[in-house]
Design a protein with these regions (language model features):
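Peri-transmembrane interface segments
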Residues: 1-20, 32-35, 57, 203-210, ...
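Short helix-loop junctions at transmembrane helix boundaries
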Residues: 70-109, 128, 426, 437-504
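Juxtamembrane segments of multi-pass membrane proteins
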Residues: 162-287, 294, 298-300, 376
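N-terminal Sec/SRP start-transfer signal
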Residues: 59, 63, 147-190, 403-408, ...
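Hydrophobic alpha-helical segments
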Residues: 2-9, 20, 38-146
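Small-residue transmembrane helix packing/gating motifs
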Residues: 214, 314-348
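Interfacial "coupling" helices/loops that link adjacent transmembrane helices in transporter permeases
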Residues: 24-63, 394-434
Length: 510
């Protein structure tokens, strides 16, 4: 049951990423509005209005929208979606009847934190964008560059043969904030896609690795020493223990195993001869981020005492969070006789009364773990990919709309001068296309690093270690999904440009 909360950090991390992107869209939309209403802002500032008053006026709509969305989300979360997601847990856990009740922590995470992010981010961003004098607003001079640069660009526009190329560059410069937002948006949504698409292969790979890394076909943990007759059975000692996880700020449950010195099941590594040295499993090494040469303090749950060991090796063939020492050393540590044992390694099923068995680790039990994880996370992941696609489409459409809305007069002039819709799209849509293509390729290493780090921190609450399996197919699928979404949105934007009534726009301009 403790694993049921393991998906919370993951969902919270993704929620924060999406809220930050939404905050970017709001901010860029408001900046576009400020540029349109610069003369009005200049008049208001000249009449004594404070910048802070204007900021709150502009961020009111984003806050109202975010608040309304949060309220709607809470209503749906406590009603419609509750029934959908509780079935996921009923499939894997034997739980009592679930009745949703108000939860203050959920309100903070899903409502207060998103509203706070939108409020703080937009306030700081918009306040900076209003950092001009009233005269600058009245003149619509809202650029932080010197006049000689502008004069140089105007000269280039007049003399350069490739007018469209130079004009496109000027559009990119005037909308560089939007293009930066596109890069950030592609980065975050690519993380979401990679995470979602790699989920199923990850669970399959996790199950396969667990089976491959079994020490033996049957591993028994006993309540009390029980003798059996078997040629393949080998005795070992194990105790429940824990290590402090610095990032989680809590103890991580592990198994401490005492292995026979000449074990046929542990023959790939040489057991430490020093009582203060230890071998840890690869999964434990990765989860604690401790490596050869580091020290690890293990707390015995039986005797409630701690001992610090030096890590001398990493054991790759282990399916859980475990550590290994000589059996005689562990027996001495837990104040037992030299011949004490409470477990068996075996290549065949042993005839042991179930009353004396704590647990049996074999291929079937390991497979059930990976299946259970996918049953819990699978429906969430599919929903997650769908929502990420919708989110990406809305994000790109909003940014493209902002760019075209800011340049409607220029587009109208181009149409009057006889430029076709295709030529105009080369100015406004092609730079976005190039930006997205470059971002999809260049950002891949950073995306892989980010998604693995997010996965690591998100899965800290799980008992065990789960590592993302990201193949080339996953990366390609993510890129194709992003490009397909973008093509659909760009076609809509191209249609909007082709239907733009330039006569009406020029007639109504200031």
């Amino acid at each position: 049951i403790s694993d049921m909360g393991g998906d919370r950090p993951m969902m919270i991390a993704m929620l924060c990423l999406m809220v930050i992107l939404i905050g970017f869209i709001f901010a860029l939309s408001i900046v576009s509005k400020i540029q349109e209403e610069s003369i009005i802002i200049g008049i208001l500032l000249s009449n004594g209005y404070k910048k802070s008053e204007l900021v709150f006026n502009y961020i009111a709509n984003p806050i109202i929208i975010t608040f309304s969305a949060a309220i709607l989300g809470n209503i749906l979360g406590y009603t419609y979606f509750t029934n959908s997601f509780k079935e996921v847990y009923y499939k894997s856990f034997n739980l009592p009847n679930f009745t949703p009740t108000f939860n203050l922590e959920a309100l903070i995470i899903t409502t207060i934190i998103p509203i706070s992010i939108i409020l703080i981010f937009n306030y700081l961003y918009i306040y900076k964008k209003l950092n001009f004098s009233p005269l600058d607003f009245l003149r619509k001079n809202l650029k932080h560059y010197k006049n000689h640069t502008k004069q140089k660009n105007e000269k280039n526009l007049k003399t350069h043969k490739n007018f469209l190329s130079i004009f496109r560059k000027s559009i990119i410069k005037s909308n560089k904030g939007d293009y930066i937002a596109i890069v950030l948006g592609i980065f975050i949504t690519s993380i979401l896609f990679i995470f979602g698409i790699s989920a199923k292969p990850t669970f399959e790979d996790y199950g396969n690795k667990l089976k491959e890394n079994l020490i033996c076909s049957y591993q028994y943990i006993l309540k009390t020493p029980t003798e059996v007759e078997s040629k393949t059975a080998e005795k070992y000692t194990t105790i429940p223990a824990s290590v402090y996880h610095k990032i989680r700020k809590t103890d991580e449950d592990i198994l401490l195993l005492g292995i026979n010195e000449n074990s046929k099941y542990f023959n790939t590594k040489k057991l430490p001869k020093n009582k203060d040295e230890i071998i840890i499993s690869e999964y434990l090494s990765k989860k604690l981020r401790k490596y050869i040469g580091d020290e690890i303090t293990i707390k015995s749950k039986l005797l409630d005492k701690e001992k610090t060991y030096k890590i001398v090796d990493i054991y790759n063939k282990s399916s859980n969070l475990s550590a290994f020492v000589k059996k005689e050393f562990l027996n001495e540590e837990i104040e037992r006789g030299k011949d004490f044992f409470n477990g068996y390694f075996s290549e065949e099923k042993l005839d042991i009364d179930e009353r004396y068995i704590v647990t049996t680790i074999n291929e079937t039990s390991i497979t059930n773990i990976s299946k259970q994880l996918y049953e819990i996370m699978g429906p969430l992941i599919n929903t997650f990919i769908f929502l990420s696609t919708i989110f990406l489409a809305g994000f790109i459409y909003s940014l493209m709309k902002i760019i075209t809305d800011k340049n409607t007069i220029q587009i109208s002039y181009l149409k009057i001068f006889g430029y076709t819709n295709t030529e105009i799209s080369k100015i406004y849509i092609h730079p976005i296309t190039i930006t997205i293509l470059i971002s999809l390729i260049v950002l891949v290493p950073l995306e892989l690093y980010a998604v693995k780090e997010i996965m690591y921190y998100s899965m800290l609450k799980f008992s065990g270690y789960l590592e993302l399996y990201i193949s080339a197919k996953t990366i390609i699928s993510s890129i194709i999904l992003t490009l397909t979404t973008y093509i659909f949105v760009s076609l809509l934007q191209f249609y909007k440009i082709s239907k733009m009534n330039f006569n009406e726009i020029l007639k109504n301009r200031e």
